[in-house]
């Protein structure tokens, strides 16, 4: 009965969304396809993230996953899927956040929030390490994404762009904007931030907490600006700043992987001493 009621409520909401005008039945069908496709995409990405986290417990990657050409191609394809889902939803572009009104304002606001968030997460990382003797991000994950050279840092900065675009299109544009006719905006922000945090499972428990907080901030920024541009900029700046800070804490570029691993061990020396 509960499932039947849920589907009945979905049907009523879809009818409200597509009320009036010719082709109403077709619009209803396409919105249902949009909802199903978006949920399927979320489940797919969730499953692959969970599988990656399990794999990392048994097998150590020898290269930076952000620089994988195969992964980059998949991300670009998924970005196309997100755009396609938004296009068939029947919703106006403002609802999806696909607007560029006051673009400079959004760029500046997103950059400022991203800078503040990145610094805040860095402070949280230091507090977690000093007070609890653990790390905000798992050691394995940190060692994988840390640039080995200055040149690699620039490649990672470029590789982050499609990562951020994909995550913001899915979690803010589709799951908040696209589902806003079905559920209250505040509830969507909470739900998406929790899922967004869970998808950062490879980063460890505290990494999930940090990502959930960031997801909530990006969601609120999306609602405030009615655009996905500002949260995209904030997301990118925050991620890049965190990588930059870790890179500099490791005494700058390293020509080999063992050098970077030595740097990570040096960062952990204080917390290990505290445990002893």
Where are the language model's segments positioned?
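Membrane-interface helix/loop boundary segments of multi-pass membrane proteins
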Residues: 130-145, 166-191, 220-227
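Core segments of transmembrane alpha-helices
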Residues: 75-79, 157, 165-172, 214
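Membrane-helix interface segments
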Residues: 102-107, 152-153, 183-190, 204-205, ...
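Alpha-helical membrane-inserting segments
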Residues: 81, 85, 89, 117-128, ...
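Juxtamembrane helix-loop-helix connectors linking adjacent transmembrane helices
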Residues: 61-66, 90-163, 181, 251-259, ...
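Functionally important transmembrane alpha-helices
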Residues: 189-198, 204-263
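N-terminal, membrane-interfacial amphipathic/helix-forming hydrophobic leader that caps
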Residues: 1-105, 187, 237-276
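Active-site His/Glu-centered metal-binding helix of metallohydrolases
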Residues: 165-170, 174-175, 202, 237, ...
């Amino acid at each position: 009965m509960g499932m039947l009621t849920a589907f009945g409520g979905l049907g009523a909401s879809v009818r409200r969304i597509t009320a009036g005008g010719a082709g109403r039945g077709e619009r209803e069908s396409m919105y249902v396809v949009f909802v199903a496709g978006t949920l399927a995409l979320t489940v797919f990405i969730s499953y692959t993230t969970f599988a990656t986290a399990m794999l990392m417990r048994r097998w150590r990657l020898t290269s930076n996953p952000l620089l994988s050409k195969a992964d980059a191609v998949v991300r670009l394809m998924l970005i196309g899927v997100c755009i396609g889902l938004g296009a068939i939803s029947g919703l106006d572009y403002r609802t999806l956040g696909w607007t560029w009104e006051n673009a400079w304002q959004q760029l500046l606001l997103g950059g400022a929030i991203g800078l503040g968030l990145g610094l805040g997460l860095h402070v949280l990382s230091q507090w977690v390490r000093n007070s609890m003797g653990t790390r905000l991000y798992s050691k394995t994950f940190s060692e994988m994404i840390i640039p080995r050279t200055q040149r690699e840092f620039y490649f990672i900065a470029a590789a982050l762009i499609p990562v951020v675009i994909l995550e913001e299109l899915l979690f803010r544009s589709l799951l908040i904007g696209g589902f806003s006719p079905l559920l209250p905006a505040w509830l969507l922000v909470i739900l998406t931030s929790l899922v967004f945090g869970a998808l950062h499972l490879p980063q460890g428990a505290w990494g999930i907490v940090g990502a959930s907080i960031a997801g909530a901030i990006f969601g609120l920024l999306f609602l405030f600006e009615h655009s996905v541009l500002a949260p995209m900029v904030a997301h990118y700046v925050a991620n890049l700043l965190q990588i930059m800070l870790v890179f500099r804490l490791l005494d700058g570029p390293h020509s080999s992987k063992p050098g970077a691993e030595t740097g990570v061990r040096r960062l952990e020396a204080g917390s290990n001493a505290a445990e002893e």
